[in-house]
Swiss-Prot record:
GO BP field: dendrite morphogenesis; embryonic development via the syncytial blastoderm; eye development; larval somatic muscle development; negative regulation of compound eye cone cell fate specification; negative regulation of transcription by RNA polymerase II; peripheral nervous system development; positive regulation of transcription by RNA polymerase II
Record's function text: Probable transcription factor involved in the development of the adult pattern of macrochaetae. Required for accumulation of achaete (ac) and scute (sc) in proneural clusters. Probably acts by binding to the proneural cluster-specific enhancers of the ac/sc complex and increasing enhancer efficiency, thereby acting as a stimulator of ac/sc expression in proneural clusters. Also required for correct development of the embryonic/larval peripheral nervous system (PNS).
Gene Ontology cellular-component annotations: nucleus
UniProt induction comment: Up-regulated by ac/sc in proneural clusters of the wing disk.
Keyword presence, Transcription: yes
Zinc finger map (C2H2-type): 305-327, 333-356, 496-518, 522-545
UniProt keyword Nuclease present: no
Name of the protein in question: Protein charlatan
Amino acid sequence: MATLIPVNGGHPAASGQSSNVEATYEDMFKEITRKLYGEETGNGLHTLGTPVAQVATSGPTAVPEGEQRSFTNLQQLDRSAAPSIEYESSAAGASGNNVATTQANVIQQQQQQQQQAESGNSVVVTASSGATVVPAPSVAAVGGFKSEDHLSTAFGLAALMQNGFAAGQAGLLKAGEQQQRWAQDGSGLVAAAAAEPQLVQWTSGGKLQSYAHVNQQQQQQQQPHQSTPKSKKHRQEHAAELIYASPSTSANAAQNLAQSTPTSAPSNSSGGSTSSSGGGGGRKKAAQAAAAAAAANGVHIQKRYACTHCPYSTDRRDLYTRHENIHKDEKPFQCYACLKQFNRADHVKKHFLRMHRELQYDINKTRRHVSAGSGSSGSGSSGSGSHHSGGRGNVTINSAGVNIDNAFLEAQRHPTSSSMSIVETIEAVASATDMPLAQLKQEKMDDGAGVVLPLHVGVMQQPVASSSSGSSGSHGGNGNGGSGSGLLKPKREKRFTCCYCPWSGADKWGLKRHLNTHTKPFVCLLCDYKAARSERLATHVLKVHNKRACSKCSYLADTQEEYQAHMSDVHGNVGNANGGGGAVTIYTTTTNEGVAGGGGGGGGGISGNISGGGPLQEIIVNPSSMVGWRLSANGSLIPPHDLLTGGLPNAATQKRGSERLFQYLEAEGSDPEDYARLLKMDAISRNTASVAQDFHKAGGVHELKIPANHQLLFNNKLPSQWTTREAAALLYSLSNMGGGSASSVSGSQRQKFGMRARQHSTGEDDENTPSSASSSSFSGDEFNMSATSPLKLSRHAIKLEKMDEMDAKDMGPTKAMMATAFLEAANYEQTAIELLASKRKIKVENDNDEDQENQQHQPHQQHHSQQQQQQRLQLIKSSPAYKLNNNNNNNSNNNNYYKDKTSHRNAVHHHRQDDKENNKTKSPGTAAVSVAAAAATSPPSISGPSNQTPFLTQMEYQNLNRIGTQFQNYVKDIINKYYAAETPLMLAAAAAALPTATTTGQQQQPELDIENLSPSKRRRLLSETEEYIEYLRNKEDITLTIAPKVQPPAPVTSLLKRQLDLSTPRRSPKKAAPAHSNSASNASRKSLNQLATLLPLLADAASQQEYLAAPLDFSKKSSSRKQAQPKKIRLTPEAVVTLLRDKYLNRMVRQRLGCLKCNQLRKNSSISFNYHTLGSLALHKYWRHGRLGSSSTRREKLQAALQKRISRGQADKC
């Protein structure tokens, strides 16, 4: 639509003026003038005495000097493809149609002007015939059209569009002040150069939140005339800035905003008042750009409509009015099918389309009304305070203006039994009194007793129970009765189907609701009951277990009296509590019993005092009201931390059974659209991992109990959670220490926590270590070493060494030697890596000459390696709650790992060939270390006080010590199968050291003499073992699963030592794993490729045997109840068709029951069907080979008929 604004052509001083308000409200005026003037004509609509913009094919593209811009030329200039515009000096050339249309528009504008004058607009602006803008404080009636009437009418119509009715005295900006300011700007003031931002405050005087200028500094400087820029971008830069402040804005903030003059904020920073010509998307982008620009300059833009009950604010009145219903006491909408009440109309529609698909939805029946008497009395008593809480723009109709029958009102105050209180619509009242509907809606009386009727009309639907009685007489046969609403709705396409059953639904919400009937996510923690609905679970708990759960805390009452006493005592005044500082406000919803609820927040808190009833549903809860619960940023409730990130939490701090039941009970609010409740239930009940863990802790699965001070012994993991790196460390320690027993408690604990601290400091164990939330903490300073560096660890070891020296007289020299070994173990890993690198350089030679040469040099090499190895004692950690088979133990000191590893497949003992020789050459320091190691590997002494106390008791590891010899034999069978004769010692030791039943220290097996092995074979086994260790170092994706079978617990007498000194990053280059080779099983030498397959075989074998299931691993965030996915069939379509045919036809037909004649003709026909029942076979023979003739006879008949048709066609053509 294009419309002109009056131009002051005869006055150069006033020509080309740029109004700030015009530039700001230009887009809004387009819509206003389109509704005011209607459709445009060929040359555009214009008023009398104003120039007309004509569209021409050529001419200047900019606005000529002395002319003022209009909506037409601005719209044309913004479009690159639009033609140029020419201007006429007068309106004499206008056509007769334009004049007639203009006169009609003048009459319409005058009527609108009169309505505004009657409604309280005391200022009317007039102008002379020359179209000069002159402020006129008094009313001067002029017969012709006033050039300023367009702008004043636009202001009134703008208020009418924004608020739904005409504005009063406070509703419009004073036209005199505005025109006076325009007159001062007549010299061509440029807005971007000298205009200050105008702070427009929207007051809360009524439904129309009128705006008034707060900026008192209206001094404007006179500057030379400049033409208005032709592009919208430049117009925004030259336009003045309007800043809107809500009523809640303080005076200081308003003054600061008025004094601040940011230059980069665009002119459309008024939020929702200005709208782009591109539609809704353009308006959103403009508002976002304005908000971003204002935020960048430190200007906070307030929305026009701000809720006094919550922080909600908006620029749209319809959204604000809809939001008001949330805080209202009553629910003005209801479902006319089931009479369920709602506070928003869109909620009714959503409910209706979900639950009553077979009925026809009618929005006119969703409005719920109370009786006229109670409604009028309530509205009258509320007074002006009902403006904010009413929610809908109510029109007060004076009783003198509308003659409503008193009998009709009396009938509504006393409804009959067949119909509830039915209020006639405004349209019906208007038609009955012969009053125009438009005038009835726009009429607004300030005082006088009247009847308040809602502007949004509707008819109360009768109850379903009385629908059979038909509509009452007041309906007048308009079909609004319950029986008339039962029209069947055409069924929509069902696009959502269940994967478990043939169910199908129309929306995703119904599918999710239906899937709960299969998954049953609501689990009773007191028994094995599972429910698909939370309310069914609550009913089950009440009826079966006779418990009543509080929805606000973890209290469970046995009787209703105890529950009510608890609610009154504990939660009785929770709504009236006043919070201090930034306390969180408690908002309540639903009203049934009249219980007052609310809360005040001092400082930054927001107060709210809303009438509530029944069990108060908390939307935003103070965290102190629910112990252990947390409040998220969006207001939803987060359940207590359940330690879902792994580890074994301390059971003493976990609630069990019925105390956790309240987490799964649904709140008792009747509103299904209570989004806070849905968020709460989603955070509690839908958390499947939490449900699985709570069920596990409530007694569903036997849980392993490990003391807090012993959890680091396992790396916070069970054997089923070990990676190959940890498994390699276990094999490494088992091969080093063939036999072991429990040492002193303090020494093993120091070594254990020292190694764990080093792993935390290097960060290598983070991939399999649970989060810090689930890790155990220790009160003593001796154990708080989980984040220390190796330097601090060494200092701590020195401190422990000094402490041990003080007790050396009582404890003996063993403890001091272990402390020294612990101190030297910090530098062990680097040396071990160097040894591995040096050993990899040794090539295996199979020639006899090289073997003899190696035999000559071997004593020297062994001696050199022993000197390096004996200087450091390997760090020993206690084994993970199971014991090495003591049949594999020996009493010799086995500190050398690389030189004395020789093995047979059944030989799992460590033997030193040159023990005596090496012991003679030891230095004093090395001898002390060796004595310490020998003491660690010796059998326990009954008289020794340190050996009498085991590190771990029987009760602590009762579930991990139930391991018998069955699994050990099974693993040995696998090793014998794949490694017949020459299994390396590392693997043999690992197989023998796998968890077995506990044996006494005196049970020992006679040692096997393995000295007869040649040095070349011994060196070869050593090389293979080192390569396998390195492979385990580099391999991260294989997990060793050791799932022991349940065995009766056995007494604990000795423990193995294991080391975990493999966490430091390797400095040697990684060796790529070689490809798998299919070598024969009877080969003399087993390659590394075969060795690498042992670990996956062990894991697979353990999983197939179904030994003791590992406890739940809560470090995995994935849900334990996943929806069943359809199986993927990787077959060709023909094969799939064949499988489906065989699957379903085989159920009802007999195999090999086919037609003999068809089988004989199979060679000629590519398609044959051999699956028949007795009935189908009889029918087939009758129709196929019966009296109608054989297939050949019918074929001949068909061919003859075809030939006849062809001949007839040819004859017709001829």
